[in-house]
Every structure is written in structure tokens, then in C-alpha cells.
Amino acid sequence: MFNFLRNKIYKIDKNGNKKRVFFIRGVHFSFKGKNSVVEIHEPLAKFDRCRIVCGNNCFVSIGSSPYRVKRLRVLTNGDNSSVKIGKDFSLTNTCEIITTPEKNLNVSIGDNCQFGLYICIRATDGHKIISLEDGTVLNKGKDVVIGNHCWVASNFKILKGSTIASGSVVGMSSVVAGKCDTPNSVYAGNPAKLKKTNITWDRECP
């Protein structure tokens, strides 16, 4: 309970009013430091076996949603990091969003995004690659941005410094390791490449 007193969890209603809570059904919280804030907007998503881990001075926000969010893992152990997920987010099963162990990293996911199975979003590689010539770290972490209304299919991975433009569809088993910056497009492959433009999508089965 001590760590919960040094950090804050809020439910936020439709009018923006905050209520401090110590429990949200379907979400396990683990605070490794102090001064972190988690905000979950109402109406709450249907959380199922989700976990949020925060270090020092971290911020996590999840928007309101009528959809199921199953096995979301938000790992922001690195200090001064943030993860923001917009409203109407859905997750079929298992997504890890990782900013740890580096500091000052951010992941942003826009509104009305649909994620499939086994998604991995990494703002950091987790281990150093070092130049033998001068000792420089060659693979420092970078922010990740996913726009609004993106459909991300199963077994997808997005790596540090990558972006996905709004309205995009990313195919199964794709790896995004750069800028997918053409809106309303289909991307697929490893690395993900532009396959089709001028599209939109919805959640209904054809």
C-alpha cells in the first residue's frame, strides 16, 4: 500500500472529473518508484488480466472504450516515461508496450485503434549496442507513435522511433522499423512496406 500512496490512480468520468482509486477491475498495478500517475477514462474498457508497471514520474493514460482489452502489459519502469492510449481501443489478446529500462521515452496510440493477437511495441531495444571505436551507444531508445483509427493485425511488432499514420492497416507478422507515414494505407512485411493507398476500414467482418 505504501507505493500506492506515493503514486496515484485515477478514474476520469465523461466530464473530466477525477476520482482517486486503488483498484480497477481487470488491471494489476505495480509501482516501482514514486510520483507516477495512471488515468483510466470512463466508461472503462472491458479489461481482462492487464498489467501496468511504473517507475518514477511516469504517466499512463487509457481512454474510454466499449471494447475488450485482454492481457495488455504496459511496462514503463524507466523513469519519466509515458504511455498514452486513446479512446475506443480494443485488444484481442496480448500486447506488450515497453519503454523500460531507458528513461524519458514515450509511446502514443491514437483513438479507435484495433489490435489483434500478440503485439509488441518497443521504444527501446532493452540492451546496449556499443561502438568499439569510441564507446558510443548506437541504439538509444526513441518514441513510438501510432495514429488514430489504425488496425494492427496479429504478431505485429513496432520498434523504437517508428510511426504509423492515421487510418492505416498493418498486416499479420509485420515489423515496423521506421516511418509508415502515408495515411489511409496498407503496410505489410518485414520490414513493413507500403502496399496500398486510399483505403479505410471498419470493425465489421466482410
What are these regions (language model features)?
Residues 162, 174, 180:
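Short beta-to-alpha loop/turn elements within the nucleotide-binding domains of ABC transporters
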Residues 130-137:
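Flexible, solvent-exposed loop segments that connect beta-strands
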Residues 153, 171:
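ABC-type ATPase nucleotide-binding domain
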